[in-house]
Amino acid sequence: MFILNNRKWRKLKRDPSAFFRDSKFNFLRYFSAKKFAKNFKNSSHIHKTNISKAQSNISSTLKQNRKQDMLIPINFFNFEYIVKKLNNQNAIGVYILPSNLTLKPALCILESHKEDFLNKFLLTISSENLKLQYKFNGQIKNPKSVNEIWTDLFSIAHVDMKLSTDRTLSSSISQFWFRLEFCKEDKDFILFPTANRYSRKLWKHSIKNNQLFKEGIRNYSEISSLPYEEDHNFDIDLVFTWVNSEDKNWQELYKKYKPDFNSDATSTSRFLSRDELKFALRSWEMNGSFIRKIFIVSNCAPPAWLDLNNPKIQWVYHEEIMPQSALPTFSSHAIETSLHHIPGISNYFIYSNDDFLLTKPLNKDNFFYSNGIAKLRLEAWGNVNGECTEGEPDYLNGARNANTLLEKEFKKFTTKLHTHSPQSMRTDILFEMEKKYPEEFNRTLHNKFRSLDDIAVTGYLYHHYALLSGRALQSSDKTELVQQNHDFKKKLNNVVTLTKERNFDKLPLSVCINDGADSHLNEEWNVQVIKFLETLFPLPSSFEK
């Protein structure tokens, strides 16, 4: 039975022939899948059913039926999407999410449920207009018919699969890989065909959830009522600092307090906004959905597009975390002395600039170990040594001042800056440092612009203090910094290419589009940056009105 919703009525009026053609095809396709399932005799013998060319050829299905005429677009196409669809079909099995989301998740089905699962799986990918590929006999295979899929999948115990769709609003095909496994069942245990993070051999008496392998597609971790040792039992928040140089009130204050001399600390390119925050939020919703709350620290009005009614978003003005004596401020060093004073912030948080963008799926484990130890992404080379020098970069002088404190405290010298990427931070450590170095914190807090006597709290001091006190470890995650004095077009295009290929091994954890040195005057830079942002993150997030 077909229900004519508003979209279908509009299509019927606009193009009657297309309406009846596609509606008929939808019905035939659904009927064909049901008929095929009914005619299937047993798992040891593939019944050869005569299926029309249009119905049996998966590639033809995708080509002949346009997504905009038949199905609503998919906002987020990933492994969770297909699990949800299979649960809607009442399929039975378990799924395993890897600790590293750039690895393949697994979908595990009992051999005794194989026939029923494949019926529902094929019906799902057909009704959702998805393209299926899988690795078979060492090669990636594009199956041409339902019979071919049945024959292949009944001959193996596990297979790597790729599902893709052009139904997203992105300019490219969306796709993901997962592992499909068929488990053998004994009266006492279930045996998985490959090793996994929990257990390959599952003793039935150890299963705490009696619905496992009996109802729905459930998380394999439900074998216990306790959290797994690698799971994080704490919330993680996200903090942005943000400024808009076009804000009228900000301009008046900047004009009033700007010193007579010019430096990179006072360059307007440092405060330029090309809506990077919008794209940064899109990247986090797409690739970092584990975040509990997002705090945006600013002395400007919120951008018009931001939905402050979203319960995940909290706008924080400088006066909420900084004393009146320090305001107004135009120094990121000053603001960063006070992030741990944000009301309601979790002890564990990630500090990010609005020009840091996530490029691939991440989870809590990319930023913290499950025991709370922070993961740092320090640069591979050292830069910090010597005394503060007038005319040297402000970030470097701030790191030098921090280095002096670290040498006195730990009797070790440090040289490595943190990469331009999201930073894993803990408020308890920041409070501890503020108490230990009150004079240095207070002096930096009251500098209107970056100054020679600043300490770089989040840029240097925190990371090495946490590392040397045993509360942080270095991570090997790759990150990418793009500046106007780089071959920026090549760098940006490379990230786009790797993203389209879903090449997570080569993709950096994040990319930083770093303005500065009057980069806003470089027209080619501006064009390429905007093109990059709109290509990588074209879909609005739930944080937008």
Curated annotation (Swiss-Prot):
The top EC class, named as a word, is transferase
Return the EC number.
2.7.-.-
UniProt keyword list: Exopolysaccharide synthesis, Transferase
Q: Which GO biological process categories is it annotated with?
A: polysaccharide biosynthetic process
| Segments crossing the lipid bilayer | none
Q: Which GO terms describe its molecular function?
A: transferase activity, transferring phosphorus-containing groups
General remark: Stealth proteins are part of a protein family that is conserved from bacteria to higher eukaryotes. Family members were first identified in microbes as proteins that help pathogens to elude the host innate immune system. Microbial stealth proteins are involved in the biosynthesis of exopolysaccharides. Stealth proteins are predicted to function as hexose-1-phosphoryltransferases.
Family membership, please give it: Belongs to the stealth family.
Functional summary from the UniProt entry: May be the polymerase that links individual UDP-N-acetyl-D-mannosamine monomers. In serotype A the capsule is composed of repeated units of (alpha 1-6)-linked N-acetyl-D-mannosamine-1-phosphate.
What name does the UniProt record give this protein?
A: Capsular polysaccharide phosphotransferase SacB
Q: What is the lineage of its organism?
A: Bacteria, Pseudomonadati, Pseudomonadota, Betaproteobacteria, Neisseriales
The gene behind this protein is: sacB
